[in-house]
Regions:
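Beta/alpha (TIM)-barrel catalytic core signal, keyed to glycine-rich beta->alpha loops juxtaposed to Asp/Glu
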Residues: 106-226
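Conserved, mostly hydrophobic/aromatic
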Residues: 17, 34, 42, 54, ...
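CE4/NodB-like, metal-dependent polysaccharide N-deacetylase domain
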Residues: 83-103, 122-126, 147, 178
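A short, structured active-site edge motif that brings together acidic residues
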Residues: 65-78, 99-106, 160
Length: 226
């Protein structure tokens, strides 16, 4: 497993399991199987409505909690009362702490966004989270967050693939030491038949999925295929 070090010194496994639409027992088994074959980065969210299954999979795997990097997220509709969503995540996952808790989207309501982020920081101080970050934030959202709080978040999770490279966002995060996590790296499966990527994969004796994962990791991105 390869790791990237955030600016606070925390090492993050670069390859993770995305748990979107992993439901009930299927979700439990997916998490257990992923951990068994070496995954150490598990990503879920309030919006996915599967935190309790993800948490059960983690517990049933028997792995030491300290060996995992667990991520969850709060949906914008909860930004005005973030405490409710945070407490729900903790109860549903039923683990001692969450490694990274993210704002899932920036929301058009800047006041609510700032309130939610401030609340996440308070819960970090209480020991609920090791760190807090964001998801789907563009450069302007990140800059506004820094104007308000004096620092950039540790992580920004956004959709990235060879078809959707987000070059401006990528460059900005690289310049400001914000770890990027690439979600939907396979473009919902459509990219797996891309002729150029098929050619590259065949040349190296790999499949297209492996090529895309390596492309992200070599660029310094964490990547969370489903």
């Amino acid at each position: 497993m390869e790791y990237i070090t955030m600016r606070n010194g925390t090492k993050v496994p670069m390859l993770g399991l995305g748990c979107y639409k992993s439901e009930e027992q299927e979700g439990v088994e997916a998490v257990k199987s992923a951990i068994e074959i070496g995954y150490r980065h598990i990503d879920t969210a309030n919006f996915y409505e599967n935190e309790k299954y993800v948490g059960r999979g983690i517990r049933e795997s028997g792995i030491d909690r300290e060996k995992l990097f667990v991520v969850s997220k709060i949906w914008p509709t909860s930004f005005k009362t973030p405490e409710v969503a945070i407490e729900y995540s903790m109860r549903a996952l039923n683990i001692d702490y969450i490694d990274m808790y993210l704002l899932h989207w920036p929301s058009q309501n800047e006041y609510a966004r700032n309130h939610a982020f401030e609340t996440l920081l308070k819960y970090k101080e209480k020991g609920y989270f090791k760190e807090v970050g964001v998801s789907n934030f563009k450069k302007e959202h990140l800059e506004k967050l820094k104007e308000t709080f004096g620092f950039y978040p540790m992580m920004n999770q956004i959709e990235i693939s060879p078809w959707l490279q987000k070059k401006e966002d990528y460059a900005f995060c690289q310049e400001n030491d914000i770890v990027m996590t690439a979600c939907v790296p396979f473009a919902k499966g459509n990219i797996l038949n891309d002729p150029k990527l098929v050619e590259i994969a065949e040349k190296h004796g790999k499949n297209v999925g492996q090529v895309i994962l390596r492309w992200n990791i070599q660029r310094g991105n964490c990547v969370i295929p489903k």
